[in-house]
Amino acid sequence: MKEILDNAKIWLSDTFDSETKKEIQQTFTSSGTSGSVVSQHHVADLNLYKTSFQKGFAHFYGNIEDYAVLALLPSYLERDGSSLVYMVEDMIQESKHPKSGFYLDDLYALKQTLLALEKSGQKTLLIGV
């Protein structure tokens, strides 16, 4: 019986946020760069999460559609569960700029795109690590 209860607790902790008691829609994980155990960030409401970072960006920088969003996030793209990749994917999509995108393993194209966007006066957001 104890094993069944322990398994139920594990399932519940993986499925429901312990603070809000809501079902988890997405679990993001840390990159583990600190050398410790990879941490988890459970999100119970993806719409709220997305609205939060979209409004935060708009508050400080303005409309995302005014920007070309370029991303160079190699180690983040190569693993699952990155909240940064999730946010940047959304920003790329919402920007609707044809040059917005990830520039993985193509630094030459990234450089040429940056030069062309600068020459045209296009507002550009480069996100990289």
Per-region residue spans from a language model:
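Nucleotide 5′-phosphate-binding alpha/beta core
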Residues: 1-29, 35-71, 93, 99, ...
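Short His-Asn-centered micro-motif
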Residues: 72-73, 127-129
